[in-house]
Amino acid sequence: MATAVETEACQPTDASWESGGGGDDEMKQALPELESSQQNGGGGGLNIAEPSGGAGREENAGAEAAQSLSHEQPQDSSEAGAAALPRGPEEPERPVRRSFQIPRKSREKKALFQPLTPGSREFEDVVNILHSSYLEPTSVTNFNYRRACLVHNELLEKEFTEKRRELKFDGRLDKELSESYAFLMVDRYQVQTICEKGLHVGQSKITILGSPSMGVYLSRYADLLQANPLDTGAMGDVVIFKIMKGKIKSIYDPMGVKSLESMLNKSALDPTPKHECHVSKNANRITSLLAYRAYELTQYYFYEYGFDELRRRPRHVCPYAVVSFTYKDDIQTPKFVPSSRSNSFNTDRNIDKYNYTLWKGQLLNKGKLLCYISLRSATRAFLPIKLPEKLDVETVMSIDHLKQKIPPALFYKETYLGPNEVLKNGMYCSLYEVVEKTRIGSNMESLLQKLDREKLVLVKPLGDRGYLFLLSPYQMVPPYEYQTAKSRVLHALFLFQEPRSIVTSQKGSTNAAPQERHESMPDVLKIAQFLQFSLIQCRKEFKNISAINFHSVVEKYVSEFFKRGFGSGKREFIMFPYDSRLDDKKFLYSAPRNKSHIDTCLHAYIFRPEVYQLPICKLKELFEENRKLQQFSPLSDYEGQEEEMNGTKMKFGKRNNSRGEAIISGKQRSSHSLDYDKDRVKELINLIQCRKKSVGGDSDTEDMRSKTVLKRKLEDLPENMRKLAKTSNLSENCHLYEESPQPIGSLGHDADLRRQQQDTCNSGIADIHRLFNWLSETLANARHSDASLTDTVNKALGLSTDDAYEELRQKHEYELNSTPDKKDYEQPTCAKVENAQFKGTQSLLLEVDATSKYSVAISTSEVGTDHKLHLKEDPNLISVNNFEDCSLCPSVPIEHGFRRQQSKSNNVEETEIHWKLIPITGGNARSPEDQLGKHGEKQTPGMKSPEEQLVCVPPQEAFPNDPRVINRQRSSDYQFPSSPFTDTLKGTTEDDVLTGQVEEQCVPAAEAEPPAVSETTERTVLGEYNLFSRKIEEILKQKNVSYVSTVSTPIFSTQEKMKRLSEFIYSKTSKAGVQEFVDGLHEKLNTIIIKASAKGGNLPPVSPNDSGAKIASNPLERHVIPVSSSDFNNKHLLEPLCSDPLKDTNSDEQHSTSALTEVEMNQPQHATELMVTSDHIVPGDMAREPVEETTKSPSDVNISAQPALSNFISQLEPEVFNSLVKIMKDVQKNTVKFYIHEEEESVLCKEIKEYLIKLGNTECHPEQFLERRSKLDKLLIIIQNEDIAGFIHKIPGLVTLKKLPCVSFAGVDSLDDVKNHTYNELFVSGGFIVSDESILNPEVVTVENLKNFLTFLEELSTPEGKWQWKVHCKFQKKLKELGRLNAKALSLLTLLNVYQKKHLVEILSYHNCDSQTRNAPELDCLIRLQAQNIQQRHIVFLTEKNIKMLSSYTDNGIVVATAEDFMQNFKNLVGYHNSITEENLPQLGANENLESQSALLENDEKDEEDMSLDSGDEISHIEVCSNFHSEIWEKETKGSRGTDQKKNTQIELQSSPDVQNSLLEDKTYLDSEERTSIDIVCSEGENSNSTEQDSYSNFQVYHSQLNMSHQFSHFNVLTHQTFLGTPYALSSSQSQENENYFLSAYTESLDRDKSPPPLSWGKSDSSRPYSQEK
């Protein structure tokens, strides 16, 4: 932003321009600061100095100017007046000059500026050029030209001549080559730059003739130099340019045309090729300087085209001279001045009336001096703020913009007639005059002119929230008043938000000020109340107060003030309102006051100010202390007491969170409003005391009674409490733990779980309601809890059971909200608890409200121990360990994820509990002792190992991003032998996880319960679930986590499933033990090994100590998927599953990881043990089916017949086995096929083919690939770069190939491009759209439809995949023509132009299609556009015509669709189009249902783009299947194909034995270098053949998604960027990025669980806006 005070930083432009010898006295008097101040038509004239060489040099310069002017006279008719320049006074001297000619100096030695002496012939020539270019002849009397100089720039003059020569060579007319002059008024600091470097584009803001960024604007007339008329006395500098107009194009005035065509069409503002100048067609109509828009309409617009772009400086514009002028206007000002304005400030008339000079100093701009100024006032004796000696102003604002922020009335001088501050709209204002201290300079004048001309205001921020504005006097004149005379002063306007002075005012005149101050300063008034009270009280005993203890006396009375405010019995002090009538009284007291002590007080006040200060912190302490006195109650006498129960200390203290305090205070107010019954209170106290003595004595009661305040400081708490407060702000409550059962209510809703070790759990509870909760629990545990006593407690506290429950509920909600604020939390949806430990056999107890009907005790035990809790008999207790058959959905198992210490560790460590809510109901069947005893004696077959009794995990880490899985993997004390799925997830952070993972789905399991109980349970669970889900969503919104709500309600199927909630599950579990399961597993594996040995083959043993890199050369097996003991329960296997397809699936998922642990634990005793790769229920007879049923490829691998195979497998560590699995996945990714597209045989294609085949890759025709491809197959299509334009559209099935992400395209020039990965990637991502005339037909398309389409396109386009609409210029031109008469067409055109600026719409240049005789776009045009935009993957042709007639378009790789179909069925039409954010678009194959594909598969196939054609080592291509994905595939087919659940279950059971069989066929080791591939094809039934192929394809896709660790670097893995050759290792960061893909898979599976019926789902899915799918 240009400012009048910024420009002093500019350096002097030129020695001859800034200083010198000659000149008149006026110019010599100019201050040096003027040269650095910004001028634009104002400011003191040019400081042009004459050279000191004497008259000879001067006359020589004049002679040169005359010679140059003699052949540079204007030839244009508009400059005809310049041809006859007056020479009369100089005629007698010419003969003399001819006889004394001085030799011309070389042009190289000339300075940039050649000064001209006023009165010389050269000076007159320049003036005549100006006079001849006036619009009005009367302007001659208004302009006074004081200084002039010629500009000599050899470079610019040479380019000017070259431009003229070029135009002449092009055959231009002499009229076009004629030279004339144009003018530009510039600021002083710009003169040097323009004359040195020429006039560059961008110097103007006018747009009437063309874009100012592409050309330059110059004035045609020398007296029309700016848009506004010049003011009298204005000074400025004019640069005269020598110009060649060239070929001129006349431009219509866009404001004069009714249609907005020119404004909407950006190309209308562009320069015209083959032209050099634009002029307005209305320029000849301008006949007066005061005509409307005269300045804009009389401009020249010059530009110049280079070879392919516009030049930044047109060469046919050359600076010729610079002239300094002064403007004087003959118009007389009105003599009549209204009498009402006679009191307004006028510097010239009233300059002597200013009595006060309030400040003198320097006005600076960015540290540089502008001028010396002073501030004066006639009525005000003080400034509102102390100003420094140097006032540095750096900010400038537009006066119009400022008046939008501040009321315009503040800028009228008549507002400030009085002596006082003016209060307007809450602002206190005062006005002063700023005058220049000396009369020798003109910087103030030039500054005034600059501010007037550009309507600017100087702004200086001040302290105390104030501002200083320096304004021109013209800006202080009301719009209806005329400024009578030129002023030489500025106005200084001070604005503050608070009053700056104390004034004695007349009666009633100050009512407004205090009132407004009262509204704007409430906090100050609050402080003033107790200060006034304190000072009034101090004044009563002022003689007795020494200066030393004055502040302590004030503190005493401030404390008393607060006591009165909180109802201590004394009357509350009320400050009387301010009475303005007392301002007029000189003496407020009738008698004189005693002031004998004033000297001592003043001395102390000056030299010891700290005595008279009251710190805010001290004030807060006083406030808190006195407020607590009111909150004290009889019950709170004991809330600071410390009690011991079973070695556990329980303390009540301060909550760490402010919100908690607010909730507490609200509850306290409600309770204190009731009267306490003293008898009941005593009864409660006696109960507490009795319980305290019976538990642990009363040793520290007296000590704790000294700490009866509600909110203790942190340092008063014990050490372990301080640790708790430091580690977590969630430590708001401390729950009491005993060996006796604690009641649990609210169906386990309370999230605040705590674990203890020894006696270390202390936390504060800050109100009597928690005291009530603890008391109720204590009474219940002591068997003293009956209905009457509970009611007594409730009534004594004024609280109902519902209130207590609601309070606990609010506390839980708050904890959920505050949980994600902690960085300690691994997931945003997990509640975390600090300082909770275990030791020995202490149980984890879930504590919630004591009013619940049912309760649960959870027992724990160390590994290898038989410790158990001895619970008291209570038929309402039920052990969570017995909920084995309680079927949960995979997203919400009963899972707490405890991390345990090792048995030998006695250290206290912080642990985490990641929890989920589960519905629990109690039964009345048996006592807990019986249950626990049975579990201690014999472990239930369905139970996990002792280490995992409390852990219910999903199978095979079905959802690896689940917070529970991550928590287990991070455990350092207890490690799960995780599966290959979970190994890749150990770096996942909370940002990678969306909360779709925490949806609760509670599926109750078996046996009947009365309908009323079932409905109650269901309602309760749904209520708790909805509350939990809502809070989680609020947390996500606070954290700005992008989350699409896919919440599904818990599934309650039949009454049959509700039965099991009321039965002890141990009676329903299988009798098979863990050891029996392991023995059976060994027998099965031995049978498999013996059958495999019959095939023959060799498999050398490998030492378990071999590194992963060595074992990598011996790939065995698929990755291991453990099987739980429930897999052998044939009863459950064969029962119908159609009623609840999730039930058994989830049951399996609960046991999978535990089975893996069991297998690992039992390895030392069973040397031949192997983990089974089936996650599904496998009947015994199905497991013994012959292996020959599975179809094999002809190149089956021989399996080792040696018995060493079993030993080798048994010796493998799980980590080694997992590494082998990852290696297999790496090998699987290297199965890449290629196709070389060539029209004619070439040597290059033959070399590339031989090279790729040598690497082990196979050639595959695209049609064969589409017919037979599997999900893991990848295809690379290679074409020579020179063939792209002519033949790439002839690739077979190009449209279908583009839809698949596993297909990539490469353009090569040589074999080295393949070897060195320097090929050109083709069809990478995104796409573009081409339409015909029907899409933009105003009769067919509405504005709303077009807007929807463009919005869809905008949402579709991303940085990774850009989409664009390419419109033929023929259609745009037609819209322009229609827009002149048709408003709808104009709206369409306007909308199109808006998106053109966003680069979403591109107007194609004119080409063959745009001919009137041809229909655009033609097929050849689309093919050419496809080749030109080779990086964009898709080309879509939109039309509203019959699509069936355009089948030939599809054969050439072009998608044809209507606009509506494009938006509704985008994913079906286009498929893959974005390499980064491809989340919801399906995979499209030749034999697949396009609408039924899962977004999960597409996410998986992102990694399949990492395609490799060289197989590194000589490893066979083994396609690995994962059984887990049969579940996902099952859910997909349920949602997309519309099959019923029973059929899906049957397919699942059919796939299980095939997976078992695949175990036999995938154990491979090759001694030879043969490359073979084992393709698993299921032939289990005729109808399931193709279906199960899809299933295995899904498995393979999901497998390929997982990344390999760095130890497999000897495998060659190629991406689009690294196509062939060099192997590389995947970094951990890449692995972590790919882990994010699990997220969408997790969410997608949950989506299907809650989706509507398959047909309607598919329909609604296809119609969803793409913006929601991305």
UniProtKB/Swiss-Prot annotation:
Residues found modified as Phosphothreonine: T982, T1049
UniProt KW S-adenosyl-L-methionine keyword: no
InterPro entries per the UniProt record, alphabetical: PIN_TASOR, TASOR, TASOR_ab_dom, TASOR_DUF3715
UniProt crosslink position (Glycyl lysine isopeptide (Lys-Gly) (interchain with G-Cter in SUMO2)): K586, K823, K832, K872
One GO MF term attached to the UniProt entry: RNA binding
Modified residues (N-acetylalanine): A2
GO biological process, one term: constitutive heterochromatin formation
UniProt subunit comment: Component of the HUSH complex; at least composed of TASOR, PPHLN1 and MPHOSPH8. Interacts with MORC2; the interaction associateS MORC2 with the HUSH complex which recruits MORC2 to heterochromatic loci. Interacts with ZNF638; leading to recruitment of the HUSH complex to unintegrated retroviral DNA. Interacts with INPP5A, EML1, SV1L, GPSM2, ITGB3BP, CNTN1, ETFA, PSMD8, S100A10, MPHOSPH8, TMEM100, ALB, PARPBP, HCFC2, NCBP1 and SETDB1.
General function of this protein: Component of the HUSH complex, a multiprotein complex that mediates epigenetic repression. The HUSH complex is recruited to genomic loci rich in H3K9me3 and is required to maintain transcriptional silencing by promoting recruitment of SETDB1, a histone methyltransferase that mediates further deposition of H3K9me3, as well as MORC2. Also represses L1 retrotransposons in collaboration with MORC2 and, probably, SETDB1, the silencing is dependent of repressive epigenetic modifications, such as H3K9me3 mark.
Name of this chain's protein: Protein TASOR
Natural source organism: Homo sapiens (Human)
